[in-house]
């Protein structure tokens, strides 16, 4: 950040986004980035493909990561991204918050299976794909309830008929610029949100 800041001047608009591990960082650290760029009054935070349920997030953050108290205090449940986004909304309710992910994310379901069972597998199954969809449905409901005004973009690109899994991450992928849900691509959805038009697409993919 110290090297980048002199190169960008004093922008009035800021988009913080990251995919996979970067998505978790986006949820946790957007307010830190904002503090480094105080000129940006128009801020959008977009989490891409970051969702893991785990009862030990607080202990992990405190004892393993040695995270600062400001982060640990946000972690009250089993969904670190939800906790972080709720805290971000409460402290900066003018920040536009977005979440995007695929319906049966291949990589995330592998890690979720490891958390749930203690067994690390490198192969998805129809069962683990279905379970991940249930977790995503729960996440969607919680985000819409606890983060008013959030924009969601759900998609199912990269479907693998062998195991029912779908693509992991969209922001760094070429199909970020292709409409996957509705008439908008993820890139267009993010651009619109940064301009103040926050919408949701692909919610029908999460219906029971």
Which sequence ranges carry the predicted segments?
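C-terminal His-loop and adjacent cap/lid subdomain of alpha/beta-hydrolase
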Residues: 1-208
């Amino acid at each position: 950040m110290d090297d980048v800041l002199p190169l960008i001047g004093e922008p009035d608009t800021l988009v913080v986004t990251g995919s996979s591990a970067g998505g978790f960082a986006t949820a946790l650290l957007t307010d830190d980035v904002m503090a480094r760029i105080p000129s940006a009054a128009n801020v959008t935070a977009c989490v891409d493909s970051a969702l893991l349920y785990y009862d030990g997030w607080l202990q992990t953050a405190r004892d393993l990561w040695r995270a600062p108290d400001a982060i640990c205090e946000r972690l009250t449940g089993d969904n670190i991204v939800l906790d972080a986004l709720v805290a971000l909304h409460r402290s900066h309710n003018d920040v536009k918050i977005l979440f995007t992910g695929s319906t049966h994310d291949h990589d995330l379901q592998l890690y979720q299976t490891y958390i749930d069972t203690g067994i690390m597998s490198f192969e998805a199954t129809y069962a683990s794909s279905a379970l991940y969809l249930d977790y995503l449905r729960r996440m969607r409901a919680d985000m819409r309830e606890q983060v008013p005004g959030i924009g969601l973009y759900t998609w199912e690109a990269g479907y693998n008929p062998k195991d029912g899994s779908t693509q992991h991450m969209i922001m760094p992928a070429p199909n970020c610029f292709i409409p996957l849900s509705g008439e908008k691509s993820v890139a267009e959805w993010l651009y619109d949100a940064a301009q103040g038009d926050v919408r949701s697409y692909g919610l029908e993919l999460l219906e029971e």
